[in-house]
Amino acid sequence: MGWACSYKLLPDGSRQIISFPIPGDIVGLRSILLRIADHSFSALTDATINPIEGTHIVKCMTEFPRLGAALMWATSRDEAMVVEHLVNIGRRNALERTAHFFMELAERLSLVGLAKETEFTCPLSQYVIADALGLTAIHVNRVLRQLREQKLLTIRKGKVHIHDLNKLRKLAGFQGGYLNSRD
């Protein structure tokens, strides 16, 4: 349990957060094949992390094809999330981008039983959210105020409360099928 992020540091010292792994996610799979890590991971709160040797994963995938299929599904889901994040940063305005971020987080946490559909714990600071969304912390603060004033979403004491799920979903243009399309 706990909160972490994957990120890439830029030459000027700034950071772009790429993702927030949640319990059950497998991180760093690409580095098994590429044999190089092109980004880093950091715990944001106390977190439990279970390391697995890459050679062990490859061996298990050979011996247990269903595990290989599950890892392929997880990798495909992660790729779909990166596509959504690229669209967020490239084409959605700050309000839509922030709404999408919280909709995706709510959906992901709900899928693993860590959230109700409209309420979840979120210890992320506005600085961390800003690094994930390609915004400044000041801009994130303004957008969160807009969401609160529109009675769509509030954050209090590390808890996110979504007040109007349908309106927030519509604002975000959120279609969460890419997160849970496994049958």
Placement of each model-derived feature along the sequence:
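Residues that recognize and position ribonucleotide moieties
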Residues: 19, 42, 50, 96, ...
